[in-house]
Amino acid sequence: MADPACCWRSGEARRQSPGGLPNDAWRNTTHDWASAVDADHLAEVRRFPTVFAPGGTQHLILEVVAYAADEAETTTSGRCVVTLHADDSVSVSDNGRGTDTRCDDQGQPIKKPVMATKDLRFFDLSDAQLLPDGHPRRGMSVVAALSKWLIHTNRRRNGAWTQRYEQGLPVTDLVPIDDEGTSGTTVHFLSDASLCGPTAVTAAELGQRTVWPHLSVEVIDERTN
């Protein structure tokens, strides 16, 4: 696996995270650190797309923005840009802390498995938090599972990387990218129309739905001239 900057700067990384421990010893808060991919979970989501993403692409966008809202709540201020691209893909970029990335006891980079494992806070709960569309929040893995492809770009103080997924499964390692001195996450995805239906998202409706305390959301529609 290519080493992202967290392992290039091992001293800094270990000050910021419990380095030197096997990842199955790290405390789970939102996801299970011991599992990088839960293929059965992803397959379940793909079998029942209307259960886990009612409303299709719009619900997937809200699932992503909800994580930016989580970040904003911890700082009382955050910014997010949702871009509807001409190829019907969608990107969601925020200025939060970025996805937690650590080095294990072997010096290998490990990122919190937000894309390919269930969110322990929401997925199996009957009374999960409701998103602004009125449907339960299930987690980022639903977005990955129901997308033809998804690219997760992550920037933290200890380095930056990108990783590509197809049908929820990672198809690349963590690929280091230039550190711009900023932090935040970009999730760029193309929903699978065979599972979610055709993309039917308007910028106006999305602007009305992406309302969270402490988070400023800008919607850019590149599909129109």
What do these predicted regions represent?
Residues 63-97, 101:
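ATP-lid-like helix-loop hinge signature
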Residues 5, 44-51, 96-173:
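Flexible ATP-lid and adjacent glycine-rich G1/G2 motifs of the Bergerat
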Residues 83-85, 153-155, 219-222:
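Short hydrophobic alpha-helical segments used for membrane anchoring or interfacial signaling
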Residues 186-225:
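Glycine/threonine-rich ATP-lid/beta-loop region of ATP-binding domains
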Residues 146-150, 182-185, 212-215:
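Short glycine-/polar-rich loops that comprise or flank the Walker A/P-loop
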Residues 26-34, 111, 173-177:
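A broad "non-catalytic interaction surface" signal
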Residues 1-77, 104, 200-201, 225:
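Bergerat-fold GHKL ATPase/HATPase_c domain
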